[in-house]
Structures are given as C-alpha cells and as structure tokens.
Amino acid sequence: MNQNENDTSADTDTTEPLEADKVLIVYYSNTGTTESAAEQIAALTGGTLSKIERAEEYGDLEAEAEAEIQEGEQPEIITDIENLEAYDTIFVGYPIWWDEAPAMISTFLANNDFAGKTIIPFCTSASDDIGNSLHIFEELCPDAVIADGLTVNDATDIEPWLQDLGIL
C-alpha cells in the first residue's frame, strides 16, 4: 500500500519492536560514508547488512555515473541477499549524486518485489537533501510503504530518526 502524495510519513504508531531477523539494510557506498551509516543502522536494529555493488567497475566514475542517472539506466549489480522475501522492513542507503540516487539503486528496486514491505530510504550527501531522490521509490515500488527518509549528515541523527519511525 502506497501513501498518498499529501502524506509522506509511514504509520509509525507501532506497539511491537521490529523483529531483527526481518530487517534488511541494503546500501551502495562509493567512499565508505554510506557504509558507515548502514553499519550504524544495522547495529541499532539488529538487522542484516547487505552491500550493493556494480557488476562492472566504473572507468570514469563521474562521466559514467552521471550518464546512467540522466539516461535512466539500470546497470547490472551484485548483492548477497539470499531471501529478500523473508524481510518485512528494508532500509535502502546510497550517496546522493547529481541530486539523485546512483543508478544501482534503481536496478535493485526494479529487480525485486517489495509488495507489502516497508522501505526506509537513507542517504549521505555533503550538499543535497534526500528529497529529490525519493521519486524512484514511488515509481519502482508502488506496492510498498515508503517511510520517511533521512539525509545522514551527522551519525547522531540516526538513532533519533529510528525512534521517530517507531523502530526503536
């Protein structure tokens, strides 16, 4: 069930904590900043951590990554997720590039069925907010609940965000 455009927050009035074995934190990180945020989320939630990697390394990162985003490409990716169906809550993390998520995130979202799952986006960025990158979740995961995302500029923001979402 998708939320309507006027309601951007997920139902956070949970009475039971999430089951750690049903929480997945999947992320793409180029410099390690997003990876650090993902590791902190995993430590706080007890969830399973999984990295997204581009199957073919970039030759010219800046030119190729920007072209992928601008042209809506979905490059081949590698992940070590064995059974996505087993997870109810999926955090998806990425750096912001050209005000968007890297193309590998679109590949991950397009290649999996998120019907009935809760997706919680988070990003890292020195200058841009998560807002402009969120459209891919609505477009590629129409049957999922998309929770409020977070731009992680400070690691101390993560725990209060998880508390606001009703996860901790």
Mark where each language-model region is:
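Short, well-ordered coil/turn elements that cap or connect secondary structure elements
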Residues: 20, 44, 114, 141-144
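Short, glycine-/small-residue-rich phosphate/pyrophosphate-handling segment
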Residues: 123-156
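Redox-cofactor binding/interface segments in oxidoreductases and associated redox assembly factors
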Residues: 92-93, 121
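Short, conserved loop/helix-junction motifs that constitute active-site signature segments
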Residues: 84, 110-116, 139-141
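Short, acidic/small-residue loops that bind anionic groups at enzyme active sites
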Residues: 112-123, 146
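N-terminal beta1-alpha1-beta2 submodule of the flavodoxin-like/Rossmannoid cofactor-binding fold
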Residues: 2-92, 99-101, 106, 110, ...
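Short Gly/Pro-enriched loop/turn and capping motifs at secondary-structure junctions
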Residues: 96-99, 114, 125-129
